[in-house]
């Protein structure tokens, strides 16, 4: 279930995802503007991608730091990687958007 649907349907209450800090950059735009619709990555996906790929944490450590399960981190990282690849190979802009996550500083 997408996090933006929080509270709009029945089922288990979604847990909050802890973000260690806001990214310094909110968007990456290709040099020759293509005019295509940008790809939106939410803060949870960006945080999971940063922890696993940039800081080279294991999925277990990243899950503990974010306060979610290892499977959730795996889904977030895969979604972020797919969106990043789409943006790079189609020449789209990448936007980092908020999605209702808590911020732990």
Curated annotation (Swiss-Prot):
Belongs to the UPF0251 family. Gene3D superfamilies: Winged helix-like DNA-binding domain superfamily/Winged helix DNA-binding domain. This is UPF0251 protein AF_0666. It comes from Archaeoglobus fulgidus (strain ATCC 49558 / DSM 4304 / JCM 9628 / NBRC 100126 / VC-16). InterPro entries: RNA_pol_sigma_r3/r4-like (IPR013324), UPF0251 (IPR002852), WH-like_DNA-bd_sf (IPR036388).
């Amino acid at each position: 279930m997408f996090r933006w649907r929080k509270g709009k349907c029945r089922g288990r209450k979604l847990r909050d995802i802890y973000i260690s800090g806001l990214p310094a950059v909110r968007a990456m735009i290709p040099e020759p503007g293509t005019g295509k619709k940008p790809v939106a990555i939410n803060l949870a996906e960006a945080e999971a991608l940063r922890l696993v790929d940039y800081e080279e944490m294991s999925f277990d450590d990243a899950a503990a730091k974010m306060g979610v399960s290892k499977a959730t981190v795996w889904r977030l990282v895969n979604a972020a990687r797919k969106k990043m690849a789409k943006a790079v190979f189609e020449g789209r802009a990448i936007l980092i958007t908020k999605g209702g996550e808590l911020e732990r500083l």
